[in-house]
Structure formats: C-alpha cells, structure tokens
C-alpha cells in the first residue's frame, strides 16, 4: 500500500509539472499572437496616415 501511495504521489507531481509547462507554453503563444495583432494595427495606422498625407500634398498643389 505504501508503494502505491508513493507511485500515485509521483504521478500527481509529474502531471502537475506537465500541466504547468503546457500553460506557460500556451501563454507564450498567446503573447506572440497578440504582438502580431498590435504590429498589424500599427502598420495600418502608418499606411492610412501616409495615404492621407499623400492626398493632402496632391490636393495642395
């Protein structure tokens, strides 16, 4: 009975570590995806401001 308890405790401990590592990996992937979205928004803002600036120059001449 004692060896069974040790085995179950070991399995629980290893499962907890594995779950923790999976959560960290998932969080890292989500952060990478969030960073890409922020970059896309920044690129869109630059494009729109450049487009508006170009139109203003063209209309001003």
Curated annotation (Swiss-Prot):
**Residues where Lysine amide occurs?**
61
Instruction: Report the leader peptide range.
Output: 1-22
Q: In which tissues is it expressed?
A: Expressed by the skin glands.
- One GO biological process from the UniProt record? defense response to fungus
Localisation per UniProt entry: Secreted
Which keywords label this protein?
Amidation, Amphibian defense peptide, Antibiotic, Antimicrobial, Cleavage on pair of basic residues, Cytolysis, Fungicide, Hemolysis, Secreted, Signal
Q: Which regions span the lipid bilayer? A: none
The record's GO CC annotations read: extracellular region
| Record propeptide residues | 23-44
According to its UniProt entry, what is the function of this protein? Antimicrobial peptide. Active against some Gram-positive and Gram-negative bacterial strains. Active against fungus C.glabrata 090902 but not against C.albicans ATCC 12231. Shows weak hemolytic activity against human erythrocytes.
Family, per entry: Belongs to the frog skin active peptide (FSAP) family. Temporin subfamily.
The entry's protein name is Temporin-SN3
Organism in which the protein naturally occurs:
Sylvirana spinulosa
The opening ranks of the lineage are: Eukaryota, Metazoa, Chordata, Craniata, Vertebrata
């Amino acid at each position: 009975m004692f060896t069974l308890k040790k085995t179950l405790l070991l399995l629980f401990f290893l499962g907890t570590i594995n779950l923790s590592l999976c959560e960290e990996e998932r969080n890292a992937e989500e952060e990478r995806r969030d960073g890409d979205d922020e970059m896309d928004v920044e690129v869109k803002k630059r494009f729109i401001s450049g487009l508006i600036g170009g139109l203003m120059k063209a209309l001003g001449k």
